[in-house]
Amino acid sequence: MIGFSAFILRNYYAAIGWNEDNLYSSLTRTSSALLDFQLPQSLILQLANSPTPIFFTSYALDALPQLNGSISYITTSMPLDEIGSGRATAFKNVIERFRVFPPPKRPQPKDEVWLGGKRIEGRDYLLYSRLHLPSLHLSGLATTRLTPTLQAHLAFLSQPAHPTSTRPTPPQTPPSHTRQPSEPSTPAPSPTPGNVFISLQHDTGRYCGEYTYSVQDGMVGLRTLYNFGWHGDEESEVDKKERREREGKRIDEEEMMEGGLKGRFSAGGEVYFSAKQRSFGISTGLRFTTVPPTLPLPLNAPVPSPPTTLTLLYNPLIGFLSSAYSAQVSPTVALATRFGVNVYSYESDLSVGGEWWIGRRRGKRGLTTDAEPQLDAESRDPVVTGIEENRELTEKMAQRASLRQVTLRDEIGEDVHAEKELYSPIPAMTDVNAGELAQQISPRLQPQQDLDDERDGVLKARLSGNWQFALLYEARIRNCLVSAGVLADLTGRQHPIRSIGLEVQYFS
């Protein structure tokens, strides 16, 4: 489960139209959500509050093994009206899950606001600070968008200096002769006071570059990511048609074949150098991601390929090669596997993981948001009720029409399959009529329908090559978000359970 500060940052990126996934550091984000998920290490309680759409506070308490806490404050230039209580927040947005991100878009500038002949729209920014107790460590983040495609980050960590106490020598203690009197005493090395990290991101949609600098170790880094087959959002339909006639179809525009995958490629790399440590590093990566099908689907269209992501990473200095494969095998199950090997020492590691969405959908539990109370069947608007019934009927008809083209099962089997698809945590694909009916529904009911289509729990499991087994359960229980995890060593006979943790978050 992601922290409240990361949740605010993601919503801020979505509000300003910044590509969250178009970074080299996010190349393996899909597989990492299933193979590298974090387990609660102890009993953690977190309370978050949103007094205004631009100001947020968070209080965290770590009870075990020792009492620690923190206080956080966040403010943004963009009002984040979609962030509310834990009951109204979409559960899929507060956890790390399998997700195939859409193709990146070129960030657009803010809408111009003029007053007295001057532009007053201001600049997008986010300010975050966190005070750790009782250590009094202070960390913070400041990000702002300099241009529509250029964004700057400044992160810092400040540690208080510990007072140096001198212990007097008792009078009865004889003087020590292990050191000459004229030899100066060597003071203990003082801890590092802190660090400042500066990052500059340049995102054009097709290309993204990230330039970083760390003050503590003098490390300079460069990360790049390039998306193949990207032509931008500004290309009109006429230009696309002329380009296809002139160049022909690209590989990712070919018609799908049975059993094939239709997707896009992304390639990138990173280079970093530390002046103080005199170290140098380099790595390269490649990612293939399937492209979601364009709706509505033709009646004779083949079965769309399942959401799939493949990644390949290579570090030539240490000879480490890693490949990962993740896919959604069913509406409620996603699996991932990763194999890493060192080409110099032939040491290898294999990890297998997955997630399973469990629990009933919120609509089946009869839950509603705080802004709109639950209505009885007799008091509901008959027009809205008719639209919802027509929407469900249209979804069934669209799925049955697509199933008849790819299967020879009888009508009963198709009806059962179509009915099961309606209870998936992922919204079902609809045709043009279903889209028109969905647009006719009042915007007031749209957020409630999105919440009703999701499930309220997910179970994750991971098995590593060293026989470390991790199990994580994340769910929404009333107004709280609960995360419980356990880490076990399958080879340990005396102490197979390594750690158990519980985290509870409450948004108000």
Swiss-Prot record:
Superkingdom of the source species: Eukaryota
Coiled-coil blocks: none
GO biological process: establishment of mitochondrion localization; mitochondrial genome maintenance; mitochondrial outer membrane translocase complex assembly; mitochondrion-endoplasmic reticulum membrane tethering; phospholipid transport; protein insertion into mitochondrial outer membrane
Main localisation: mitochondrion
Annotated stretches, region: Disordered: 160-195
Protein keywords: Membrane, Mitochondrion, Mitochondrion outer membrane, Transmembrane, Transmembrane beta strand
GO CC annotation: ERMES complex; SAM complex
Keyword Mitochondrion carried by entry: yes
Location of this chain's protein in the cell: Mitochondrion outer membrane
Membrane topology: Multi-pass membrane protein
Record's keyword annotation contains Transmembrane: yes
Entry's free-text remark on domains: Lacks alpha-helical transmembrane segments, suggesting that it resides in the membrane via beta-sheet conformations similar to those predicted for other outer membrane proteins and porin.
Oligomeric form and interacting partners: Component of the ER-mitochondria encounter structure (ERMES) or MDM complex, composed of MMM1, MDM10, MDM12 and MDM34. Associates with the mitochondrial outer membrane sorting assembly machinery SAM(core) complex.
Family under the similarity heading: Belongs to the MDM10 family.
Stated role: Component of the ERMES/MDM complex, which serves as a molecular tether to connect the endoplasmic reticulum and mitochondria. Components of this complex are involved in the control of mitochondrial shape and protein biogenesis and may function in phospholipid exchange. MDM10 is involved in the late assembly steps of the general translocase of the mitochondrial outer membrane (TOM complex). Functions in the TOM40-specific route of the assembly of outer membrane beta-barrel proteins, including the association of TOM40 with the receptor TOM22 and small TOM proteins.
Record protein name field: Mitochondrial distribution and morphology protein 10
